[in-house]
Every structure is written in C-alpha cells, then in structure tokens.
C-alpha cells in the first residue's frame, strides 16, 4: 500500500532557530548562543507546493542511503528525472522507490545489494524524491 499525502497549497510558515555553528558528530564543543536566521522547514523541503506530495517508505531496499522503512519522502512531480535521481516509479502495476539509471539502459537500482536491479519494459515516474524525513525518536 502506498500512502500519498499532499501538502497544503499554501504551507503555513513555521520557523525555528538555525544555529550558525556546525555540530560535529564527534566530540561536542560548546554551542554558540546566537542564530544565523530562522529556518522554515516547508520552504527548505518544498520548492513547489502544488507539485509536491509525501510518501511513506516501506521496506529496506534503499536503507544504505539512509532511507528506512517508515521514513517520509518529499516528492516533487514537477522535477525532471535525471540520471542518479531517487524516484517514485510504477512498473508492472507496482509502486517503488529506486535510483534511476538512464544510460546505458533504463533501470531502477536498489541501493541494498540484497535486491535485484529492475529493468522495466514500461515505466512511469511519478516524481523525484527531494528529501527524506527520518525520526530518530518514536513519538508514541
């Protein structure tokens, strides 16, 4: 089952502070006490609200690139699919999220080596995945 969620036509602006200091993934340093600007996640993730929808990922064929089952994908159906893009596609009546290969032959590539490459005879691309949203803590 594929769950599609369309954003509001005019996203409500909701900002949070964006700190100028980068946060190292190693040993922490004291954080600065100031912000560079306000960050609106709608503006950051959604370039074209009327052409954007959200899809929840299911499965683990793309986990090596950080897309896990249950993650939310931001998909822009107005983006022109290009070599190497992550796309939402339909092939053989099934929806899938895969990396698009255009040359030398059209293929849908899983990132997880446990899954086969798909060489569809017919392919419809519904949009280009422009962002993943991954929660690190359950909200239950």
Curated annotation (Swiss-Prot):
Sites marked Cleavage: 25-26
InterPro entries reported for this sequence: LexA-like, LexA/Signal_pep-like_sf, LexA_repressor, Peptidase_S24_LexA, Peptidase_S24_S26A/B/C
GO biological process, one term: DNA repair
Record-linked Gene3D superfamilies: Umud Fragment, subunit A
Top-level division of the source organism's lineage: Bacteria
Enzyme Commission no: 3.4.21.-
Function per UniProt: Involved in UV protection and mutation.
Name of one Pfam family that matches: Peptidase_S24
Keyword field: Autocatalytic cleavage, DNA damage, DNA repair, Hydrolase, Plasmid, Protease, Serine protease, SOS mutagenesis, SOS response
Active site residues according to the UniProt entry: 61 (for autocatalytic cleavage activity), 98 (for autocatalytic cleavage activity)
CDD domains hit by this protein: S24_LexA-like (cd06529)
Organism of derivation: Salmonella typhimurium (strain LT2 / SGSC1412 / ATCC 700720)
Disulfide-bond pairs as recorded: none
Name of the protein: Protein SamA
Signal sequence extent: none
């Amino acid at each position: 089952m594929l769950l599609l969620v369309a954003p509001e036509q005019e996203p409500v602006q909701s900002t949070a502070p964006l700190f100028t200091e980068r946060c190292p993934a190693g040993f922490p340093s004291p954080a600065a006490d100031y912000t560079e600007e306000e960050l609106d996640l709608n503006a950051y993730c959604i370039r074209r609200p009327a052409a954007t929808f959200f899809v929840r990922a299911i499965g683990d064929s793309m986990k090596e690139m950080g897309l896990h089952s249950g993650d939310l994908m931001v998909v822009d159906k107005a983006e022109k699919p290009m070599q190497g893009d992550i796309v939402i596609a339909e092939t053989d009546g099934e929806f899938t999220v895969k990396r698009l290969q255009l040359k030398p032959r059209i293929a849908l590539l899983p990132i997880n080596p446990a899954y086969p490459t798909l060489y569809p005879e017919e392919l419809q691309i519904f949009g280009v995945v422009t962002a993943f949203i991954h929660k690190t803590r359950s909200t239950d």
